[in-house]
Amino acid sequence: MPNATCFLVAYAIVLVLELLRWLDGTGRVPLPSAAKPWLARILLVGAAVGLFTHSLYLLDRIFLSASTSSSLRLVSSWHDWAIVSAWALACSYIWLLLKRRESLIGLFVLPLLLVLVGLSLAVPSEPLGNGSSATLWRLVHGASMTIGTMLVTLGFAMGIMYLIQAYRLKRKRPHQGVLRLPSLEYLQSFGSFCLLVSAASIGFGLVSGVIMNLVRDGQVNWTDRGILFSGGLFAWLVFAFWIQWQFVKRGKGAQTAWMNVLSFVIVAVAVLLVMSAPHGEVPAKRLDENPQS
């Protein structure tokens, strides 16, 4: 089975191909006209190969979880979280590549994807927590938080592209053939969608996390760093989407993009803070009372 390094290299090669497309547009590395269609095809094949090996790795993790535990424990470690987030981001990239083949979206999405895969190599792969109960809610909680953070990351890429595109249009600088990006309307609507759905996902992750603790421990530690930050993130994302919607109604597109960028920064800081502390573990008091569990 492939390891994370395999698809890390595959995605890095795809990023190099995206850079080659950009350099061709600038005229610094001109390509023959006959080679350009082939470059686009190779780019798509490379992304598909990366996603395929990525998917095989995820399946291997699932089978390993099923063979070593009485229940499925996918998205139960920080390694799983980073790998699944990167996989979802890779799926989004390929979908965008098929829908917007002329746009150089990969220059903004692929670096974030590589950071997530690199992060997965640096964080522990051991499951968070000690108990095997409430596994369904653990899975729902992990999946919801993963989807939420992935969408915030994708929204960040859309926000950066919007700001670049708006700056060029404002300065009336030529952009066709240099750095081809989607329209401002597309980037704004996509960014708003990412912010809205990420808020819903984080909120569902918060609720499922509370239920998981109630089922597993019979209580909820409301001062737990994970719960506090999840609640704070949900409140921020709801507030950010409301502010963004107000900006949309007033025609302030750049401010809507900045809300996506700011949301990504806040979520990234919160995730790093949660990573630095125990999360999802069975309380020590409960372990003392039930040494056999």
Q: Model-found features: residue ranges?
A:
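Acidic/Ser/Thr-rich, low-complexity mid-to-C-terminal regulatory regions of eukaryotic proteins
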Residues: 132-146
